[in-house]
Amino acid sequence: MDPKQSRALLPLLFTGVLMGALDLAIVGPALPAIQADFGITTRQLSVLFNAYVLCQMIGTPLLAKFSDRTGPRLAYIVSIGLFAAGSLMLVIARGPELLYYGRAVQGFGAGGIFPIAAAVIGNTLPPQERGPALGILGTVFGLAFFIGPVMGGLLLPYGWRWLFLVNLPIAAVLIAGAIRLLPARSEAPSAS
């Protein structure tokens, strides 16, 4: 991979990881507003949060295996697409059921983003660039848990649906970038 393409690829991967991890933490400040809007119990609210986490854990090995079979481009697009579809379900939800399904779909899609990004870095960058890039990837993931509640608090005055609506244009840009930048098939790691 030429350096120019690598400079464009890494922000694409980092942004995807940030978006997926952010939505785990961004929902915290919105939980009371969601609870009030739908009249759901605290137990139902925990289901809303846990659906994301559980489906993310399920999605991680399945979407990573899908990436191994189909290549990172399609798997990343599917992961981001599922995440966006779940976000859209949350935006249009008029009842708690669609909220649960939306969080589950969103979490499942998010499950593929990090492992695919890590695999692309491992398979496309030269060895001397892999460690720093993977370190930044991990930092971005961790940073999301600091940024998430802050962003949630900033967007909440506009309505809790904005926490999920903001994902849609970002996902569209990520999908367009993946089509252009991600390899269709996994490349063998370079030994140079």
What kind of feature is each model-predicted range?
Residues M1-L181, S186-E187:
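Transmembrane-helix bundle of Major Facilitator Superfamily
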Residues P189-S192:
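Membrane-interface "helix-start" segments
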